[in-house]
Amino acid sequence: MTTHLVWFRQDLRLHDNLALAAACRNSSARVLALYIATPRQWATHNMSPRQAELINAQLNGLQIALAEKGIPLLFREVDDFVASVEIVKQVCAENSVTHLFYNYQYEVNERARDVEVERALRNVVCEGFDDSVILPPGAVMTGNHEMYKVFTPFKNAWLKRLREGMPECVAAPKVRSSGSIEPSPSITLNYPRQSFDTAHFPVEEKAAIAQLRQFCQNGAGDYEQQRDFPAVEGTSRLSASLATGGLSPRQCLHRLLAEQPQALDGGAGSVWLSELIWREFYRHLMTYYPSLCKHRPFIAWTDRVQWQSNPAHLQAWQKGKTGYPIVDAAMRQLNSTGWMHNRLRMITASFLVKDLLIDWREGERYFMSQLIDGDLAANNGGWQWAASTGTDAAPYFRIFNPITQGEKFDREGEFIRRWLPELRDVPGKAVHEPWKWAQKAGVKLDYPQPIVDHKEARLRTLAAYEEARKGD
C-alpha cells in the first residue's frame, strides 16, 4: 500500500500548503501527518513564549482540521533537530511510509537536518517544496547569475519574473476515501508559553484568512499613508500568521491583487506588495549567504566596531526606561503584546545600536525572545539594516534622533501616552521631551531622565564606525 507522510513545520495550515496538496493528490494513498516539537532547539533560537502559544493553538486546530479530512496528525517531541532525524526515520519505518512530503526551510540548521533526513530514508521518495516564498530562491538573479544585494533591483526583477508566471494557490485537500476520523488528544508543547490577543493575532486558519481579506479590502489601499503612525491601526497584523505558516505568502499576494489589482503597477496596494517582496528578499539572501543565520554581519568591516558593554543601558532599553518616550513606549508595547509596529522597530533598533552603541545582535536576540511574529530572516534583515551592517542597509552615518522621530510619527503623543501612563498628564507635544516640561512646571515625573545625550551619542557612534572602517 502507498503511504504518504506530510511533515509539518512552519506551515500549519490546510489551504495552499504545497506539501500537503502533493501528498493528497493520489486519492488511493494513505496519508499521515507528522509534527515534531524541538523545545531545546527553540530555546537556542530564542523562540518567544507567545509564539509558542500561537503554534500550540494552531497545532490543535490543525489536528482537528486534518482529522476531518481523514488524516491523523502524529505528534512527537525531542530536544533538537538532530534528534528529529531519527524520529522521522522511525515514523516512516513504523508506518511503511513510501513517500515523504515537506516544505523547505532555508535556515542553516533546518537545511542540515533535512539533508540528514533524506540521507537516512534511502527507500522513501522525498519531495520538498518552496512553500514559504512566492518565488523560490534562485528564481530572481542578476545577469551574472548572482544574488541581488540591493533591494530595488531585486524588486524590479522579482516583479518581472512574477509577470512571466504567477504561482497559483492550491486548494485544501478533500476528505480521504476512508472518511473522517476522531482527532487525537490535545497537544501541549513542553515550552514556556504566554497568552496573547487573539483578536489581533488569530489562531484559527479561517480567522487568519478573514483577517487577510479584511485588510486587503480596507487597509492595503491606504497602507502607504497609514503605515508609519503607531497610534493608527494601519498595518496588516498578518506577520505572526506568516511566521508560523498559518497563512502562505501566495494567499497574501492573490488576495491583494483580487482586491487591489493595480498593486502590480504601482497603484493602491503596491506599498504593501513591497513589504511582501522585502520578506522574499531577506529569505533569498539567507539562502545564498548562510552566514546571516549565524549572526554574522553582511558588511565585514562592521564586525570591527567596538561595541559598548553596558548591562544597565541594555536593561533600560529592554524595559522601556531610557528616558526617550517613543523608544520606551515601543519597547513596552513589545513586552506587553509580543508585537511592535514596524516604524518603531526601526526607531528602537537605531537607538540601541547608534545611541547606546550596543551590539545589534543583543537587540536581535531580545526581539526574537519577545516577538509573536519572530522570523529569523526578517528580524536579522531589519537589525542589520538599522545597524548599517547588512546589504542595502541604512548608511552608518544615518542616525535617527529619537525625539524628532517621536514628533514626526506620533505628533500629538497619542501612542506614547497609551503605553507610558506616567506621561499622561504632560500636555501636548511636550510629551516628546517631558524632562523640559517638568523642569519648567516644577513637577517631578515618575519617569527617567534620558540615559544618554543624543548629540554626544551620535558623535561617539560616528567615531566608532569610522575607526572600524579604517582597516577596510
Question: Regions from the language model: what does each represent?
Answer:
Residues 1-166, 463-468, 472:
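Trp/Phe/Arg-rich N-terminal binding region typifying the photolyase-homology
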Residues 21, 90, 206, 328, ...:
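A broad detector of short, well-ordered amphipathic alpha-helices
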Residues 145-299, 409-410, 414-472:
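Glycine/tryptophan-enriched, flexible segments
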Residues 233-422:
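Active-site-proximal binding-pocket segments
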